[in-house]
Amino acid sequence: MGLLDEAIAQFQKALRAPEGRLKTSEQLGISFFDKGRFAIAEAVLRRAIESLAGGDEDKIGLIYWLGRALESQRRFEEALRFYERALAVDIRLLDVGDRVHRLTTGAQ
């Protein structure tokens, strides 16, 4: 079992606890993303966004990484919607501004 697989197993175990579920879900999604399992990352991140309490300010990492997972699946319009949602909360978040620019100018 590789390090990412071990991390995934630990994040999945941690999700059983009620505290810290937003960050744990984000890290689990990123781990699947890093493994190239974009559809699974999408499912994890989307489920967390839809089911966990909190606003976009609390879920900004989940929203950004869902955009990344969608973009990696070449679902550019959907990715753009999530990037713009993240941009509305924090214009300086990682490379979200560059990603929005690329997707809106067709420079994928």
Where are the model-predicted features located?
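TPR/TPR-like (Sel1-like) alpha-helical repeat modules
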Residues: 45-50, 76-95, 101
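"A position-specific structural signal for the A-helix of alpha-solenoid helical repeats
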Residues: 27, 64-65, 99
